């Protein structure tokens, strides 16, 4: 049976050997070039392929149409993936009539995603395993073909568990590959309600937080012990690595991170104490704990910290351009709730941020980004993270003032992007769900969905195209110049301070603000083209929490990523939004101050937005990247968001007149 294989690491090598032993004909193998920054303790798939006389390739993007066509020419009957690190597109999966199968290092549906070997140890699991499953478009979500359980012993570390999993995988493949070859397999659908998903781990994720329990820290040490990069901590600014440890039943009132003794080297934790059995100072040699204490100059009562002492003292400086806007003011509030951010902001007004103006860690200048270019360049250079949130983002303006939209949304933001490249600053750029345009996918996916817009004579697309081109420019700067970036795409965020009722009076606002104005003034709610267009509405608190996690960037997991931020469960048509808003309005304690409801009125989009408008029937996000990179899920129901947004705006209305 002809097969094409995607493979890497030891699992890739043993998978290839198992296929050959089972009589499969391997037409080609796709693998990765080794990362020079990664310790290569594992077997080489490329070398094995060469020794076996099998063509081997390591493309940067195997999902490129040229590679899809080459794989199609190989006519594989079945496809296998063994620890290949990139998601394989659906077009490739569909090339094999007998299907595609992936070997995953956990007991699916638990521990989908990256680095399951390390995550099970971090989380103190006592059992894991290997799973062979059918590949579908969603990562690690296909039906299970075979599983083998592996016990995790208390003394297992990453490398010993790795060897156990390799042994189990070899057994599983020996038993299962002949059955796949003869079409004699039983598939069991995964239970989605039991699924868990974990993201990529980097060396920076493995710092020891001494306020946690000794058992939790010991599990971290086990999870990343040699040949992985190791768990680490600091003495002042001196970094050291812990290679092995023991949980010590020592009851101490010492502060977490304090040295209890140096022989053995015992460190107080949030609960219990951790004995450092072996470790390494800086780039030195491995030594036993008491010698490490001597090398680091530790004595009883010394304090360890999770980050360098100098880093712990300096706040992260965040520059927010458009700080008075809907996202900017809510994000400022979230950042200032923490004690490690300094926020610098620029905007043409300050009404939404007036509550922060006296905050010691908030610095505001009133001004226009098209005028204050020197101030902006200076602060890009000064700050650590830049969020250029200035944009015209109201649909009526796309047809009313398309050139102004282009000048502000594209030209001014391009200048800021180039400052970030020049001074090597991290940029978190607000893309938009509008870039997907008229995409027909059920879920809009950051990495695979096509971005489809209308003809040139429909100026409503100038916003979408301006944002899309900036996305592509930022991506290219990341690839070619090393720009550190994250693109985030908000899907219909709603909440207090979304536009204002005065903006709604001239039509320059988002949907819910316009609908609230209609209720306040007693004018008919206008349903553009019947209001059947569906959107997924997201509470501003959910959106800001995701954006905050992008800024935090744990383990640099957000670098180079595009992340949809939306709530696919909160899908509703504009008509349904209007009905929900009306029901909330009728129950509101201030209802009697406002005129009677004037009804719904259907209007054509051309009469409301102008002749250059086109609408989109649906816009539902895939949030797999948000789950993977941010460990984030939206939580707030749409009705709660509507109630709070309505309440906020009703309480801004002058109610000096008598009730109606």
UniProtKB/Swiss-Prot annotation:
Descriptive protein name: Bifunctional polymyxin resistance protein ArnA
Xref: Gene3D superfamilies: 3.40.50.12230, NAD(P)-binding Rossmann-like Domain
Annotated organism of origin: Escherichia coli O6:K15:H31 (strain 536 / UPEC)
InterPro entries registered for this protein in UniProt: Arna-like_SDR_e (IPR045869), Bifun_polymyxin_resist_ArnA (IPR021168), Epimerase_deHydtase (IPR001509), Formyl_trans_C (IPR005793), Formyl_transf_N (IPR002376), Formyl_transf_N_sf (IPR036477), Formyl_transferase-like_C_sf (IPR011034), Lipid_A_modif_metabolic_enz (IPR050177)
Catalytic site: 104, 434, 619
Feature type site, description Raises pKa of active site His: 140
Domain of life from the UniProt record: Bacteria
Keywords assigned: Antibiotic resistance, Lipid A biosynthesis, Lipid biosynthesis, Lipid metabolism, Lipopolysaccharide biosynthesis, Multifunctional enzyme, NAD, Oxidoreductase, Transferase
Residues at the site labelled Transition state stabilizer: 102
Pfam families: Epimerase (PF01370), Formyl_trans_C (PF02911), Formyl_trans_N (PF00551)
Residues annotated for UDP-alpha-D-glucuronate binding in this entry: 393, 398, 432-433, 460, 492, 526-535, 613
Gene, per the UniProt record: arnA
Sequence positions that bind (6R)-10-formyltetrahydrofolate: 86-88, 114, 136-140
Protein function: Bifunctional enzyme that catalyzes the oxidative decarboxylation of UDP-glucuronic acid (UDP-GlcUA) to UDP-4-keto-arabinose (UDP-Ara4O) and the addition of a formyl group to UDP-4-amino-4-deoxy-L-arabinose (UDP-L-Ara4N) to form UDP-L-4-formamido-arabinose (UDP-L-Ara4FN). The modified arabinose is attached to lipid A and is required for resistance to polymyxin and cationic antimicrobial peptides.
Keyword Signal assigned: no
Pathway(s) served: Nucleotide-sugar biosynthesis; UDP-4-deoxy-4-formamido-beta-L-arabinose biosynthesis; UDP-4-deoxy-4-formamido-beta-L-arabinose from UDP-alpha-D-glucuronate: step 1/3; Nucleotide-sugar biosynthesis; UDP-4-deoxy-4-formamido-beta-L-arabinose biosynthesis; UDP-4-deoxy-4-formamido-beta-L-arabinose from UDP-alpha-D-glucuronate: step 3/3; Bacterial outer membrane biogenesis; lipopolysaccharide biosynthesis
Annotated stretches, region: Dehydrogenase ArnADH: 314-660
């Amino acid at each position: 049976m002809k097969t094409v294989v995607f493979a890497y690491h030891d699992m890739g090598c043993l998978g290839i050997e198992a296929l050959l032993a089972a009589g499969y004909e391997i037409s080609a193998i796709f693998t990765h070039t080794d990362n020079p920054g990664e310790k290569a303790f594992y077997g080489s798939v490329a070398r094995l392929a060469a020794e076996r006389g099998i063509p081997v390739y390591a493309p940067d993007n195997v999902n490129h149409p040229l590679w899809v066509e080459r794989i199609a020419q190989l006519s594989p009957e079945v496809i296998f993936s063994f620890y290949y690190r990139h998601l394989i597109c659906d077009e490739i999966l569909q090339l094999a009539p007998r299907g595609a199968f992936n070997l995953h290092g956990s007991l699916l549906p638990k521990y989908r995603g990256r680095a399951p070997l390390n995550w099970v140890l971090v989380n103190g699991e006592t059992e894991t395993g290997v799973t062979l499953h059918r590949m579908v478009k969603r990562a690690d979500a296909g039906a299970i073909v075979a599983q083998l359980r592996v016990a995790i012993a208390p003394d297992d570390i990453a490398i010993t568990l790795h060897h156990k999993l390799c042994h189990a995988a070899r057994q599983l493949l020996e038993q299962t590959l002949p059955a796949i070859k003869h079409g004699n397999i039983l598939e069991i659908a995964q239970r989605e309600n039991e699924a868990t998903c974990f993201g990529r781990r980097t060396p920076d994720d493995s710092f020891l937080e001494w306020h946690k329990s000794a058992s939790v820290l010991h599990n971290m040490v086990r999870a990343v012990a040699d040949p992985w990069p190791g768990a680490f901590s600091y003495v002042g600014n001196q970094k050291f690595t812990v290679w092995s440890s023991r949980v010590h039943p020592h009851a101490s009132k010492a502060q977490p991170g304090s040295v209890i003794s140096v022989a053995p080297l015992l460190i107080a934790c949030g609960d219990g104490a951790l004995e450092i059995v072996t470790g390494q100072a800086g780039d030195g040699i491995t030594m036993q704990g008491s010698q490490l204490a001597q090398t680091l100059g530790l004595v009883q009562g010394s304090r360890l910290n999770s980050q360098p002492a100098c880093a712990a003292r300096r706040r992260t400086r965040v520059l927010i351009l458009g700080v008075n806007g809907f996202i900017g003011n809510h994000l400022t509030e979230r950042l200032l709730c923490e004690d490690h951010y300094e926020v610098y902001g620029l905007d043409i007004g300050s009404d939404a941020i007036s509550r922060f103006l006296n905050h010691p860690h908030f610095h505001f200048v009133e001004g226009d980004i098209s005028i204050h270019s020197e101030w902006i360049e200076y602060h890009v250079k000064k700050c650590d993270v830049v969020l250029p949130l200035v944009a015209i983002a109201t649909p009526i303006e796309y047809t009313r003032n398309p050139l102004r939209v282009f000048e502000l949304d594209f030209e001014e933001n391009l200048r800021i992007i180039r400052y970030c490249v020049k001074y090597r600053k991290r940029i978190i750029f607000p893309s938009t769900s509008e870039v997907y345009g008229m995409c027909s996918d059920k879920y809009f996916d950051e990495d695979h969905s096509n971005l489809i817009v209308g003809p040139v004579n429909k100026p409503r697309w100038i916003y979408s195209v301006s944002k899309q081109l900036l996305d592509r420019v930022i991506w290219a700067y990341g690839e070619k110049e090393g720009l550190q970036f994250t693109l985030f795409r908000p899907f219909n965020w709603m909440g207090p301070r979304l536009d204002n009722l005065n903006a709604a009076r001239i039509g320059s606002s988002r949907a819910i603000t316009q609908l609230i104005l209609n209720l306040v003034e007693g004018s008919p709610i206008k349903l553009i083209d019947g209001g059947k267009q569906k959107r997924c509405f997201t509470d501003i608190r959910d959106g800001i929490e995701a954006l905050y996690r992008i800024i935090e960037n744990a383990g640099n997991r957000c670098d180079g990523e595009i992340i949809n931020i939306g709530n696919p469960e909160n899908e509703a048509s504009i008509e349904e939004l209007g009905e929900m808003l009306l029901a909330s309005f009728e129950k509101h304690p201030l209802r009697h101050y406002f005129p009677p409801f004037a009804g719904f009125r259907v209007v054509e989009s051309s009469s409301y937005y102008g002749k250059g408008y086109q609408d989109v029937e649906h816009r539902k996000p895939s949030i797999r990247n948000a789950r993977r990179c941010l460990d984030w899920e939206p939580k707030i129901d749409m009705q709660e968001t509507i109630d709070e947004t309505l309440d906020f705006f009703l309480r801004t209305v002058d109610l000096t007149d008598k009730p109606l």
